[in-house]
Amino acid sequence: MKKILLFFLLILNFTFGAGKNYYHFEGKIGNLPVTMDVNVLENYVNATYSYDKFGEIIPLFGSLEKGKLILSDNNEGENFEGIITNNKFEGTWKMGAKTLKFSLVENYKNSLSLEELKNLNMNPISLSTTNDNFTRSTSVSYNKNGLAVAEEYTYVYSGGAHGNYGVNYRTYDKKFRKLIS
């Protein structure tokens, strides 16, 4: 019975979640091409971006309120501050004394939309499920060149000093429309 209830709660959460939960942007910081994936869970945001020339994925964290998105990394003092409107994310990138304008446009041409990702998975992807002792959330950590990597975070508290948590990654192939790892 608990499994059936959990299944329906996941479907309700998945179907009636407020607002957009995932963006895949492409564009430029200054004159450098970049790709960014933004995952929104209520007002909390985690994101990754990479300079297309180098490919190294840089994690970012932040908040989204009334269309204003603020992201920063934990190490280098890098910050993005901008507005999301009409499928665009535009604003200012800062690192130390250096400031550049950025303009990113939502584009899924060589990536998977969240809807496609949901349909590829054997089990529905729930963006977030929470109760008193359990949290599960899914975000997209890479989405480029026909591959998408979904990061599934789970936390369970069952007593004691602290809870247990884990992260699982699933890689999907757009061309063959299947889970590959």
Give a label for each model feature.
Residues 12-21:
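Bacterial Sec-dependent signal peptides at the C-terminal "C-region" and cleavage site
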Residues 20-181:
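Compositionally biased intrinsically disordered regions enriched in Thr/Gly
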